[in-house]
């Protein structure tokens, strides 16, 4: 593992528009206005960050007996990243999930235990019955969406649920640091160092400040700074994840806008290193999109971390802006390779297609039967096959080269588009330094972690929301327990 150094120490279903509609039994309650002010209180839970994980943690802390729960949000609005999710439709959950759907450099067993604390079905019931969302399954993708297709509804209802539980939300409240102090009664508390106001004292802290992806919404990595500097945690070095990659298109062509379902896999670094012994990672039959800068789509995003992590940690390319290494840097980085089979068909299937009669048919026509025309033409150019070449005239050496291009094309990655385009941040506070039963820091008791600040992220498809809901719930319940017992 790479570390940045720290100091040592349902109800009935109805069929509608191709989805299974789950009818919520939650009561509809009116909106509650946000409380803008809060005061220092050594019996309070301070939640740093009003994203999906932070609001979930606040809800469960209040629901499980915490006397006072205050959410500190540095911007003027809660849940900004929720509003951007799923093209503003907000894919709140996958239909099912496995540990293999997530990426962590920590011990996988820790992640497995955390995820086992709340399964997808129970999480769905909470979203419907307690938060008040009506969800449906999009069968093509196996994802849960709100029937309203509105990410704003998800944010608003989550915030309203918190307010109903008595949670206070303070906007423009930027916490810059933490310091352990005495609570005046022989116990410990935490002092919050505020940017524009006096320090405040609280009993426990839930750190849910997110990562560095989409900095426009206010995520700037402050949570990592606090975890390392004030809480003495190591960090798995952060890097942009679920991020578009940059590079040249096949055949020197420009193919922006071309989309195709592919079978994509990552071949690990060769040479017998520990990283090189890892199994191939796959993203089967998923969308691949050519962009003006290179490559995107679920297939690319899900495996981008395999390449980006190496680039960042070899050349320090973890900047917010677009990052493009030179060809020499890429070679020096000894990157894993992303290998694509266009259309997902096997080499044997393509070989049979190219050999099938009549011999006077054009090779280009055979490719266009299974691929978008612009991509088919670009792959012919990449293989050096003329677009007027007939099947009967295709030489063996050219056929073999074309088969390689069709079924094991190595994507020429030059770099990535940085945190500005990354959906999440990889790396973060290691799970090995967190109590997996409570999400409490093993280095600084009284501080809990949840969400993207942890060394966990999921693939495209609602898995990052599942991590936010699950880790937020566990942190919130755990943070409330000692306070509710002492009241």
Mark where each language-model region is.
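Residue-level recognition of phosphate/Mg2+-coordinating polar/acidic sites
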Residues: 77, 98, 107, 122-142, ...
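Short hydrophobic core segments
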Residues: 46-48, 72, 175, 199-215, ...
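Glycine-rich FAD pyrophosphate-binding loop
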Residues: 62-87
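N-terminal Rossmann-like FAD-binding beta1-loop-alpha1 element of flavoenzymes
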Residues: 43-71, 475-480
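A conserved short coil-to-beta-strand element within the FAD-binding core of flavoproteins
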Residues: 171-188
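Core beta-strand elements of the Rossmann-like FAD/NAD(P) dinucleotide-binding domain
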Residues: 41-43, 194-204, 283-285
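Short beta-strand to alpha-helix junction loop
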Residues: 111-119, 141-160, 214-219, 246-250, ...
């Amino acid at each position: 593992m790479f570390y940045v150094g720290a100091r040592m120490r349902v109800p009935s279903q109805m069929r509608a528009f191709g989805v299974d509609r789950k009818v919520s039994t939650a009561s509809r309650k009116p909106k509650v206005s946000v409380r803008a002010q809060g005061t220092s209180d050594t019996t309070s839970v301070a939640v740093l960050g009003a994203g999906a994980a932070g609001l979930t943690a606040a809800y469960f802390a209040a629901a499980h007996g915490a006397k006072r729960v205050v959410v500190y949000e540095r911007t003027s609005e809660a849940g900004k990243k929720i509003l951007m999710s799923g093209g503003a439709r907000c894919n709140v959950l996958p239909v099912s999930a496995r540990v293999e759907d997530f990426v962590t450099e920590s011990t996988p067993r820790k992640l497995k235990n955390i995820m086992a604390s709340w399964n997808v079905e129970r999480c769905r019931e909470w979203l419907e019955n307690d938060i008040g969302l009506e969800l449906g399954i999009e069968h093509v993708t196996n994802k849960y969406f709100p029937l309203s297709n509105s990410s704003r509804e998800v944010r608003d209802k989550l915030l309203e649920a918190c307010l109903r539980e008595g949670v206070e939300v303070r906007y423009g409240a930027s916490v810059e640091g933490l310091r352990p102090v005495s609570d005046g009664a022989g116990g410990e508390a935490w002092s919050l160092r505020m940017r524009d106001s006096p320090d405040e004292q609280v009993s426990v802290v839930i750190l849910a400040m997110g990562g560095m992806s989409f900095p426009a919404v206010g995520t700037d990595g402050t949570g990592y700074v606090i975890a390392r500097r004030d809480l003495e945690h190591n960090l798995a070095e952060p890097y942009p994840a679920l991020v578009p990659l940059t590079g040249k298109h096949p055949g020197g062509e420009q193919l922006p806008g071309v989309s195709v379902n592919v079978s994509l896999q990552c071949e690990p670094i060769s040479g017998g290193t520990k990283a090189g012994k890892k199994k191939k990672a796959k993203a089967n039959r998923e969308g691949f999109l050519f962009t003006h800068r290179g490559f995107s789509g679920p297939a690319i995003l899900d495996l981008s971390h395999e390449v980006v992590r190496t680039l960042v940690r070899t050349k320090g390319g973890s900047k917010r802006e677009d990052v493009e290494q030179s060809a020499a840097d890429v070679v020096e980085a000894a990157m894993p390779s992303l290998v694509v089979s266009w259309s997902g068909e096997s080499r044997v299937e393509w070989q049979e297609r190219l050999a099938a009669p009549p011999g006077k048919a054009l090779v280009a026509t055979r490719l266009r039967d299974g691929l978008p025309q612009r991509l088919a033409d670009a792959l012919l150019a990449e293989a050096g096959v003329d677009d007027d070449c007939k099947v009967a005239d295709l030489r063996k050496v050219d056929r073999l080269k074309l088969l390689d291009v069709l079924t094991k094309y190595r994507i020429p990655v030059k770099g990535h588009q940085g945190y500005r385009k990354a959906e999440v941040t990889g790396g973060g506070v290691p799970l090995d330094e967190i109590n997996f039963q409570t999400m409490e820091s093993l280095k600084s008791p009284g501080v809990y972690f949840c969400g993207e600040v942890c060394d966990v992220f999921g693939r495209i498809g609602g898995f990052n929301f599942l991590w936010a809901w699950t880790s937020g719930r566990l942190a919130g319940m755990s943070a409330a327990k000692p306070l509710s017992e002492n009241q």
